[in-house]
Amino acid sequence: RQGGDFMHGRVLLTPLFCLLAPVAVIPLLVPEASRMARSAGYLYAGATGVLWLAVVGWALWAANSPGMGPDATRVTATGIVDERRFYAQATGHAHPLTAADYLDYPRMRAVLTAIRNTPDGALLLPAGNYDTWDVVPAIPPPPDAPTGPDGDRNGPHTVFFTNLGMLGMNVGLDVRVIDQIGLANPLAAHTARIEDGRIGHDKNLFPDWAVAEGPFLKEEPWIPQYLDEDWIRQAQAALACPETESVLNAVRAPMSPRRFLSNLANAAEFTRYRIDRVPLYELARCGLPLPEPVNPPYTGLPATGP
């Protein structure tokens, strides 16, 4: 249950290593010393020594560079971060290794409480403070909907948050975890990158899209005040763009021989495909009609005032 363009590289590391391991035992033929001129040998040894010293120097610099400024509180211009130091500081654990260690990260315990308190399902959005989540309720199930063995319902839950690893390990496999920067969210991954943004974190999908694409209530008073009902309706309409549907079906539809061949044939096109993260602009890009607005646009008329 993993997805997103950015994550494929991490997920493929283990099988790639297994594929390359047999190649590592194939012997390489090295020229005999007698066949190498003395001057060439000196040059070869010197170049190897310089390269080794350069790697050692770089390693020493990297090991002693905090990467987030002297107080480890901000991402510097390099975009390189000492992740261990960051999470040690954020969780209060010198060596955070287990899922339980990351429950002390801001919002982590609160997300478990929010899921327990919404048995019919909900979309959870990170609130401005660190111990609560904003809840968008799921569309209520019918009265005769089946319940679990303990009599409780297990509605659709989606959590919209950046830190996927600690979240996924603690909420379990029945909770959908997506992010706004495209690490494991195909929709966010296909938005245009923000210029000069931190690499791998240079996209930012508005939460209105998460409401639009899920089985959640999409109107007031069920949505947080910082979301716009018209934006949600526009995002919902924009998801009907045929090209966007094709890209999303490539990763969401059931795998079959036909789907596999289609993904292979369209891989380059799907990878290049980008949407606009502003729903109104995305509708214009795709040539789709604008939904009827819920709230009439403000025009400043009639004029009021002295």
Summary of predicted features, one role per range:
Residues 86-306:
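C-terminal luminal/periplasmic domains and tails of membrane-associated envelope-modifying transferases
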Residues 29-69:
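Signature aromatic-anchored transmembrane alpha helix within multi-pass, membrane-resident enzymes
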Residues 4-39:
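Hydrophobic/aromatic-rich transmembrane helices and adjacent perimembrane loops
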Residues 21-24, 60-64, 174:
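Phosphate/oxyanion-binding loops and surfaces in catalytic or ligand/nucleic-acid-binding neighborhoods
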Residues 54-90:
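Transmembrane helical bundles and short interhelical boundary loops of multi-pass, membrane-embedded
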Residues 5-9, 62-69, 168-170, 185-189:
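Short catalytic/ligand-binding loop motif for oxyanion handling, primarily in non-cytosolic enzymes
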